[in-house]
């Protein structure tokens, strides 16, 4: 793992993954994502039953998506596969099973302390 990154993202769910992708699209190349779980999208993995529908619009509430990740209705499995593919295709660094304990500002950078240190 590198010591200095342009951006560090805490949380490997859909929002964290999207933040990493958007950062790279904007030209920020040294990106790392920290996730305390064994894989991305822990909430979906843990609380959604197998084959459960994952809808783009929650209970009919239309959401206008802006950005570079295409999201569509699917199942738990197809949604997890989609995010696997997005991570692989974009090539940002991901540290799973890495819980961020604190972040401290130090001059013009931030220090990130994890349970692993």
Where do the language-model regions lie?
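N-terminal Rossmann-like FAD-binding beta1-loop-alpha1 element of flavoenzymes
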Residues: 3-33
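Residues in the short beta-alpha loop(s) of Rossmann-like NAD(P)-binding domains
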Residues: 36-37
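Short alpha-helix immediately C-terminal to the canonical SAM-binding loop
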Residues: 41
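N-terminal Rossmann-like dinucleotide/flavin-binding domain of flavoprotein oxidoreductases
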Residues: 45-116
């Amino acid at each position: 793992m590198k010591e200095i990154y342009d951006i560090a993202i805490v949380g490997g769910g859909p929002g964290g993954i999207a933040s990493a992708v958007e950062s790279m699209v904007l030209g920020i190349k040294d990106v790392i994502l920290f996730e305390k779980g064994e894989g991305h999208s822990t909430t979906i993995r843990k609380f959604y039953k197998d084959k459960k529908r994952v809808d783009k619009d929650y209970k009919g509430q239309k959401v206008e998506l802006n950005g570079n990740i295409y999201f569509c209705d699917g199942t738990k499995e197809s949604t997890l596969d989609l995010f696997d593919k997005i991570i692989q295709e974009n090539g940002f660094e991901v540290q799973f099973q890495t819980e961020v304990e604190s972040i401290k500002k130090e001059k013009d950078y931030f220090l990130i302390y994890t349970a692993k240190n």
